[in-house]
Amino acid sequence: MAADVSVTHRPPLSPEAEAEAETPETVDRRTPEQELPPLDPEEIRKRLEHTERQFRNRRKILIRGLPGDVTNQEVHDLLSDYELKYCFVDKYKGTAFVTLLNGEQAEAAINTFHQSRLRERELSVQLQPTDALLCVANLPPSLTQAQFEELVRPFGSLERCFLVYSERTGHSKGYGFAEYMKKDSAARAKSDLLGKPLGPRTLYVHWTDAGQLTPALLHSRCLCVDHLPPGFNDVDALRQALSAVYTPTFCQLASGQDGQLKGFAVLEYETAEMAEAAQQRADGLALGGSHLRVSFCAPGPPGRSMLAALIAAQATALNRGKGLLPEPNILQLLNNLGPSASLQLLLNPLLHGGASGKQGLLGAPPAMPLLSGPALSTALLQLALQSQNQSQSQSQKKPGILGDSPLGTLQAGAQPSNSLLGELSAGGGLAPELPPRRGKPQPLLPPLLGPSGGDREPMGLGPPASQLTPPPAPMGLRGSSLRGLPKDSGPLPTPPGVSLLGEPPKDYRIPLNPYLNLHSLLPSSNLAGKETRGWGGSGRGRRPAEPPLPSPAVPGGGNASNNGSKAFPMKPRLLSPIASNRLPPEPGLPDSYSFDYPTDVGPRRLFSHPRESNLGAHGPSRHKMSPPPSSFSEPRSGGGSGGPLSHFYSGSPTSYFTSGLQAGLKQSHLNKAVGSSPMGSSEGLLGLGPGPNGHSHLLKTPLGGQKRSFSHLLPSPEPSPEGSYVGQHSQGLGGHYADSYLKRKRIF
């Protein structure tokens, strides 16, 4: 159904009548988008000459029919009268691609060598076909040549660039051509310029066939009419409005496949002159309350093809910068990211917005709530709960590497713990099947930072922070010593200010070295001496001491029976240099855990070696390794006599050439004379000196030049020719060892 619109147009008038008809009413009826001032004839001539020169500036020629053995030099000699910028010869196809100085030389070369002969072969010379020519349409009429070059130059090297001007007025017709040296540059320019807004217009870019583009075809016969009234669909009214001078041969409104109008129309005239006259009369014409904007389309295609091209170009321009799928909303994005990533994404700008510490000109901002919007607060809360539920369910379903997760044993009604490590228990590690204590859950991590329970007092660690119900020992660990023992589950008061490592010894001598100072290793609150408290507390008395389990004595003279009752004993000398006897374990405490192994199996068995017969009379103990002599540590008030040196420790560089026992004895006498310890300053760092029955030297790696010696792995070096004398110019043991190594290295 045709819309009820009013069309206002003027019949063709002579120049004299046209001047007389310029009335305010006529000016109001025709309001073009942009009025351009008239140009003088000289400026019109210059613009037209520039367009013609650029249009003919095709300087690339193609030579066909060359002999198969032609060389590049022969082509240069053939075109010696011209200035060659580029020449490529394809011997297999017998062609040459040549770029000359300008289009005039290219035309002259074509006229001279076309259908000429070279070695009795006829040549064919013509312009190279190009596929990098673009037509940029819907430009503002006031755009100059320099501005157009600036618009298209950033995408690549230009071969030609020019605007098309009207032969009557000299003004731009609103489109121009740009030819690039490479096709990929032209494709990039088309992709970036299509749909780009330039002033009040939107650019349209089309590929152009340079072979079909002639000087006569530079001027378009098609017009594009936009700024139509909303919902305008009367084709006859539009045809009548633009038939004031000439009647168009084609007039159609643009519509999509669904029949929806696109808001513009395309008209085609018989000649370019008719189209130009219709454009000048119809531009700014009032139609249905709107002023039409009439512009030139790209030249070449007919009106029907141009209409389809403009519809496709408009769709591309509207979807500029968008993907094929619709943009997802914020909820879909957060759902795809997951709860943890969503929380981090939402909270980062809120938490770190003022992390820089910079304040505005008016000072610090007032205190504002973290989440001002209730919807955002609710969303974050739901995400947090969902993330927590997922993490808990995953941790309960998936067993850990060492067995079931400790989270799986937590009851549903248990309250969350306030501490990450929980409360220290009275014993060692927790069994996986430990039931939670009433009111408080079990700690998530066992107290692996140090011993607890009965081991704390002799080590100088102080009493434990609190006590939980001791867990039942696994069947593989508990033995007959646990049967029949009563359970103890009474809580103890938590002493204030006690760290995980407990209290340091009161008579500990702080080293003078600032890097080994105790202040840099332990908290300052633990440096002050405190009263040593046992397991007893208010309302609870100390249990009577029970005799320790009997075990064979150590050859070194120390009593290691209590230490041998545990799988991995913590020595009393580990954190204190004071010699003291270990308190017997109390019943029901994890201190009474033990292995049910024979008396001939102990920690020394872990380090056993077939090289035991070399020690002679100093036979190794069947239960524990012999500690080093007392000369390896500081004098102690209550220590036992030192035993023979273990064959696993060699304390000096001489152990490279002698057995461990002999080298250790030599080094011990040397240390007595010098007054230093072979273990270095680290021996007294935390009281790690080995006691009479301690094996702290097993917990260390030998320092720099101190290595374990095994005479059966490396051959014994030859004795030094200089004996034990080391003079000023003597090579000593090091030089002799190097010579011996060079002699014997081939056996490896």
From Swiss-Prot:
In-chain residues carrying the UniProt-annotated modification Phosphothreonine: 31, 469
Q: Which residues carry this modification: N-acetylalanine?
A: 2
What's a Gene Ontology MF term here? RNA binding
Q: Where is this region: Disordered?
A: 1-42, 390-505, 525-647, 672-731
Organ and tissue specificity: Ubiquitous. Detected in aorta, brain, gut, heart, kidney, liver, spleen, uterus and skeletal muscle.
Annotated InterPro entries: Euk_RNA-bind_prot, Nucleotide-bd_a/b_plait_sf, RAVER1_RRM1, RAVER1_RRM3, RBD_domain_sf, RRM_dom
Low complexity composition-biased segments: 675-685
Looking up PROSITE patterns in the UniProt record yields: RRM
Q: Which CDD domains match?
A: RRM1_RAVER1, RRM2_RAVER1, RRM3_RAVER1
- Name one cellular component (GO) term: cytoplasm
Question: Cellular location of this protein?
Answer: Nucleus; Cytoplasm
* UniProt KW Nucleus keyword: yes
Which keywords describe this protein according to UniProt?
Acetylation, Cytoplasm, Nucleus, Phosphoprotein, Repeat, RNA-binding
The job of this chain, per UniProt, is described as: Cooperates with PTBP1 to modulate regulated alternative splicing events. Promotes exon skipping. Cooperates with PTBP1 to modulate switching between mutually exclusive exons during maturation of the TPM1 pre-mRNA.
Name of the protein described by the UniProt record: Ribonucleoprotein PTB-binding 1
Species of origin: Rattus norvegicus (Rat)
